[in-house]
Amino acid sequence: MNQLTNLSSAEISAQHEQDAKDLTRILPASKKVYIEGSRPDIQVPMREISLTDTPTGLGGEHNPPIMVYDTSGVYTDPNVQIDLNKGLPSVRQKWIEERNDTDVLSGLTSKFGQERLKDIRTADIRFAHIQNPRRAKAGKNVTQMHYAKQGIITPEMEYIAIRENQRQHEAVDMRQHPGQNFGAKNLKEITPEFVRQEVAEGRAIIPANINHPELEPMIIGRNFLVKINANIGNSALGSSIDEEVAKMTWATRWGADTIMDLSTGKNIHETREWIIRNSPVPIGTVPIYQALEKVDGVAENLTWEIFKDTLIEQAEQGVDYFTIHAGVLLRYVPLTANRLTGIVSRGGSIMAQWCLAHHEENFLYTHFDEICEIMKAYDVSFSLGDGLRPGCIQDANDEAQFSELKTLGELTHRAWERDVQVMIEGPGHVPMHMIKENMDLQLEVCKEAPFYTLGPLTTDIAPGYDHITSAIGAAMIGWYGTAMLCYVTPKEHLGLPNKKDVKDGIITYKIAAHAADLAKGHPGAQARDNALSKARFEFRWDDQFNLSLDPDTARSMHDETLPKEAHKSAHFCSMCGPKFCSMKITQNVRDYANNLTNSDSEVEEGLKAMKEVYQEQGQKLYHKV
């Protein structure tokens, strides 16, 4: 891939080679498997983790493989040749064509998209295989919500049902705590009909633009597995197209369910094209960021026409959901005046500045119905932005935040009237005891539309560790009902994250999401925990590593003190050593108890024999000698 960078050609080539190895290396003891649906082209990917047998001394039983949800796409399929210059193979193209409700356009229709194609300065960095976009035929609505309301189960819905189940019905150890789901539904099996019903009622969304056929369908809703989003994107201070594509593929490898491209630097249009064409997961954006770049960063120069063209430009590229800050109303802006940190949302501050400069209502609000018409022509989902979210715990749950949330509830109904899919963005910075109020109010005013939250961060004193401060809040709000958690990296508030930061943020949020699934009692959520705990008790070290969210780190930490291969079968670790391992002691206690059981039976027989002698001797305790 040719592109703008300060590295030499040799350095770029070496970096590409290393990235390719990192991205395509399958995790240890794992293999990509596909579950076929009702038709041959529904092939749902999962990762199967093989386990070793229990040692003979501990019972010698066979441990079946564990199936886990997989977001890595074909990058971890050894049978697929990866070529970033061509993009990923299409998953949904045939399904889209079969519905016969879209037209292939003769070319891009957005003014800016056409300009970029003609600009010779972008030729070297442009994706080489740009396809003509699709759009709904006149009078047609192509959203998954529209199909669901018509009673149609699409291939995407069947795909999702298979994916959500993770074949947990085959798991051997399904013991699980019941959990507290706060009114969510815990079905033992997700069916295509249930997926359809949840989408029709607005309780879940399937972000799947008709111009992103490469994506593997997924669902966001509180009655499904809690999902996580990873943010990437360049800035005016750095990063390149190569780096952003690498971050995207790296993020999906470790479990990102969706990606948001928040680029604000150079070549936003081209960067986004590369990302979408190579992404197996839905891509979200904040269109106002690019619109602002088109007016050289001067918020008051923004117009509806510029924003509308930006929406069409991004929809034709294949963006699956838009964050749109239509709830930042003119009358709400003064409510932020006494805040400790004011308006911290970039999108929110842009629209607040525009409203004050013109003393007019937010044009995203006044043109909302027109935005809906664009969204339904491409099946782009709304992610209604929380532009007035609290930027510190002092500002949590204030009048500005909740006023905007109520407006987002109103906008949700307006979108649903046009069968446009909606999720709602949430805070932010909220101390633990104030988190549930956010979830309860959102469920009430937005009628159970999926909630998508950034954390929330539960304290403000830990720069450099905000992936942890936010994961605490994320686990809690995920338990209460949030459908998707936006990850936070260690670099939050400090700088642009690199690959390591992205991975750290994702693993942290995978923990939070899984903890929420366990707390809700989501069926099958505990199967992997049970398998890992069993491996730990049986000192199957490799199985412990392989079942973990980050096998590489688990193995590396173990090997820092016990690096030899023989240590992988040792019945202790460096924490306690061979004499004080609690699990080894427990096994000894079990062995002792088993031996006691045998001894007890022998004693029992002896007592029985003495009883017979006693009866034969007339049941007398004493006898004359």
Swiss-Prot record:
Pathway field: Cofactor biosynthesis; thiamine diphosphate biosynthesis
EC code(s) of this entry: 4.1.99.17
Domain of life: Bacteria
UniProt binding sites for [4Fe-4S] cluster: 573, 576, 581
BP term (GO), one: thiamine diphosphate biosynthetic process
Keyword set includes Metal-binding: yes
Subunit architecture: Homodimer.
Task of the protein: Catalyzes the synthesis of the hydroxymethylpyrimidine phosphate (HMP-P) moiety of thiamine from aminoimidazole ribotide (AIR) in a radical S-adenosyl-L-methionine (SAM)-dependent reaction.
Protein name: Phosphomethylpyrimidine synthase
Organism, as annotated: Acinetobacter baumannii (strain SDF)
